[in-house]
Amino acid sequence: MKGEAYYSVRMRASENGPHEEGGKHISGGERLVPFIGLNDAVSDLLEKGMSHSRGRPDFMQIQFDLVNEPIKLVQPLRIETNETVSAEEGQALARELISRAGVPESAVEKAFQGIAEYWGVRGAVLFDIHSGRRIDGRKEKGVRVSRLDWPEADFQRWAALCGVPPNPRLKEALAIASKVCEHPAVIAELCWSDDPDYITGYVAAKKLGYQRMTKMKEHGDESGCRIFFVDGSADVKSCIDDLEKQPVFIGQEVNHESIIR
């Protein structure tokens, strides 16, 4: 990838105005592509934003900018699926997994108690495992993991090797989790989607990999959750900067051809 210029392409879509003016979040997306791939990336993100089950957006922003920093290659987390028959079972297993990842049970309990407060947060909440408090200071904005991509050809090879369906939702979620858990300050991630039609969620951690729970909420529920359990004694500002700004490719082998399509 030396000598090749890459661009970070980002999309956000909302209903009833922009997010910062109280609009309802509909969709978002990220790509990292060379100049020749910009048209396809913008078209793909436009289609994603216009066809989401959360509603029809009346505001959409698609922007791109040149990536000036070296792009880091991060290996995808290993994946495991846990069949859960109810939201209660799924969330109970999530609590157990987060504790196994190294988060004190008291902090896990406090985080789950505060989930209802975080439903309006557009990005992720950073939660200190020592104090049991939110520490990102971003209010409704939260922390948006950005500047990442998983080239399609590499993702297809990975999915075939792991024997999992190569669906775009898994690709996006695992890419985010892999970048997040690569950071040394992050102990674990808890996530489930705000998509009312998608009830699967996950816990991710360096120690545990990407642990999917097949049911984490009820059908029709538009509330989502994304919490990063972090070591608050680390440099939190640096952690946020890396999650938002460090360009990352997920994958085993990344080359120019696989990134274009």
Swiss-Prot record:
Name of a matching Pfam family: BioW
GO biological process entries: biotin biosynthetic process
Pathway assigned to this chain's UniProt record: Metabolic intermediate metabolism; pimeloyl-CoA biosynthesis; pimeloyl-CoA from pimelate: step 1/1
EC number(s) reported in the record: 6.2.1.14
Record key words, sorted: ATP-binding, Biotin biosynthesis, Ligase, Magnesium, Nucleotide-binding
Gene Ontology MF terms in the entry: 6-carboxyhexanoate-CoA ligase activity; ATP binding; magnesium ion binding
Catalysed reactions, semicolon-separated: heptanedioate + ATP + CoA = 6-carboxyhexanoyl-CoA + AMP + diphosphate
UniProt function note: Catalyzes the transformation of pimelate into pimeloyl-CoA with concomitant hydrolysis of ATP to AMP.
Quaternary data: Homodimer.
NCBIfam families reported for this sequence: bioW, PRK01322.1
Family membership: Belongs to the BioW family.
Protein name in the entry: 6-carboxyhexanoate--CoA ligase
Gene name of the record: bioW
